[in-house]
Amino acid sequence: MGWITEDLIRRNAEHNDCVIFSLEELSLHQQEIERLEHIDKWCRDLKILYLQNNLIGKIENVSKLKKLEYLNLALNNIEKIENLEGCEELAKLDLTVNFIGELSSIKNLQHNIHLKELFLMGNPCASFDHYREFVVATLPQLKWLDGKEIEPSERIKALQDYSVIEPQIREQEKDHCLKRAKLKEEAQRKHQEEDKNEDKRSNAGFDGRWYTDINATLSSLESKDHLQAPDTEEHNTKKLDNSEDDLEFWNKPCLFTPESRLETLRHMEKQRKKQEKLSEKKKKVKPPRTLITEDGKALNVNEPKIDFSLKDNEKQIILDLAVYRYMDTSLIDVDVQPTYVRVMIKGKPFQLVLPAEVKPDSSSAKRSQTTGHLVICMPKVGEVITGGQRAFKSMKTTSDRSREQTNTRSKHMEKLEVDPSKHSFPDVTNIVQEKKHTPRRRPEPKIIPSEEDPTFEDNPEVPPLI
C-alpha cells in the first residue's frame, strides 16, 4: 500500500530542484496510492496533477488547489464525483476507467465554470441510456466530452429532453447501487473465508494435518529419528505449493470491481514479501576476512583489488595506492603499524606486510588531486640487531646535519681568499687599449754604412735608394 509522503513528492520533483511549495506539475502515477492527502497543504501552486493507475477510492483533500487546471484520475477506484468545487481554475478532468455509477454526481461540477473537457469513458455510467445527453444538459460549460466536441444542436436537444432523461438515469443509478451492494457483501464474505483458511493453515497440527493417525505419526517419528529429509526437498515442496496457489489465484475468474483490484494488490504484496524472504535466506553471509592469524602474523590482503607499488629506500618505504580518482577521501582510512600497513577503502581492507620496521608516528599519507592516488611515506627505524646485542645506528636527518654545519661555522671564523689570476670575468679596464700619438710624417731612415765595405763614402746630395 502506497502513501503520499514528503519524500515521495520530493523524489518526483526533480524538475523543480526538489522544491515542494512552488511545484506547478506533479506526477504520482503507478504508486499504489489508496488515499489522497497532504497535497493541498504542501503544493498549493499545482496546475497539473497526474494520479492515474493508482487505487484511490475517493476524491478528497484537493479543495485548496485553487490554481489546478488539469487533474488526471484515470484507472482508479472512484465511484462518485465530489469535493472539486474548490478547484476554481479546473479546465480538464480525466476519470477514464473508474467505477462511477452515480451519474447524477456530475452536478457537483456545475460550480467549475472553467471546465471545458471531461472524460468518463470506461465507467459503468457510460453504459447508461441517454448518458451523453444527460451530461451535456447538466454541464453547460462543457465543450468536449470523452474526446468528442459538443455541438450547439446537441446541447439544445439535450436540454429539451432533460425532463424525460433525468428519471431514467435515476432508475439506472438505483439498479447499479443494488448490484454494487451485493458485490460488496460477496467480497466481504470471500475475504472472511480466506482469513479463516489462513488461520487454519497457520494453526495446523504438529504433523501438518487436522487428523491424527497413530501409525502414521509413529512411523513419521521413527523415520525422523533414523533418516532426516534434506532441506532441499522441503524447499522444493514449499515452492511447488506457492506456485500452485499463485496459479490458482490468477486463473480464478472474478469481476472487475474495486475489491478485486485491492485483492490483486494484496496478493502481489504477499508474493513480493515471500520473494524478499527467500532472497534474504539465499544471501550467504560472508565470513569476516582474516587479516591477522591466531599466531599474530599479518597477512597480505587486497580485497578492493586496486593496483599498488612499493618502493624500499634506505631511509623510508613509499607505498603508492591507485585509489579511484573521484572517490571521496572520507571513504579511506589509513592505519600504519610497525610491521604492516592497512588501508580501508569503502569498508574493504587492503593490508600489506612491510619488508622492514617503520615509524608509525612519523609516517604521512597524501593524496594526489590530479590522479587520486594515495601515497604513504613510512620512515624506517634505525635499529640493527646483531648476535644478541643491539647496536643502534644514529639515523641523522638532513635537519640535524644542517644544524651541525651551522654550529661548526659559527665556532671558526672563515675568511674569503680570492686569487686575482683566477677571475672568471674579464678586466673592464683593459678592454680598450690607448694608442700612443705618432706623427703623420715618417722619419727618414738613417743610412748606416756597412762595416764590410771600407771604400763607402756618404754623399748627402745623392738621394737614398728605395
Curated annotation (Swiss-Prot):
Involved in dynein arm assembly, is important for expression and transporting outer dynein arm (ODA) proteins from the cytoplasm to the cilia. Acts as a crucial component in the formation and motility of spermatozoal flagella. Residues 269-287 have a biased composition (Basic residues). GO terms for biological process: axonemal dynein complex assembly; cerebrospinal fluid circulation; cilium movement; epithelial cilium movement involved in determination of left/right asymmetry; epithelial cilium movement involved in extracellular fluid movement; establishment of localization in cell; flagellated sperm motility; inner dynein arm assembly. Pfam families: CS_DNAAF11_C, LRR_9. It is found in: Cytoplasm; Cell projection, Cilium; Dynein axonemal particle; Cell projection, Cilium, Flagellum. PANTHER family: CILIA- AND FLAGELLA-ASSOCIATED PROTEIN 410-RELATED, LEUCINE RICH REPEAT PROTEIN. Residues 178-204 form a coiled coil. LRR repeats lie at residues 22-43, 45-66, 67-88, 89-110. It comes from the Eukaryota. Residues 301-396 form the CS domain. It comes from Homo sapiens. GO terms for cellular component: apical cytoplasm; cilium; cytoplasm; cytosol; dynein axonemal particle; extracellular region; motile cilium. Expressed predominantly in testis and in nasal epithelial cells. Residues 185-202, 398-425, 433-445 have a biased composition (Basic and acidic residues). This is Dynein axonemal assembly factor 11. Changing residue 87 to R: In CILD19; no effect on interaction with ZMYND10. Residues 450-460 have a biased composition (Acidic residues). Residues 185-206, 268-288, 391-466 are annotated as: Disordered. It is linked to Ciliary dyskinesia, primary, 19: A disorder characterized by abnormalities of motile cilia. Respiratory infections leading to chronic inflammation and bronchiectasis are recurrent, due to defects in the respiratory cilia; reduced fertility is often observed in male patients due to abnormalities of sperm tails. Half of the patients exhibit randomization of left-right body asymmetry and situs inversus, due to dysfunction of monocilia at the embryonic node. Primary ciliary dyskinesia associated with situs inversus is referred to as Kartagener syndrome.
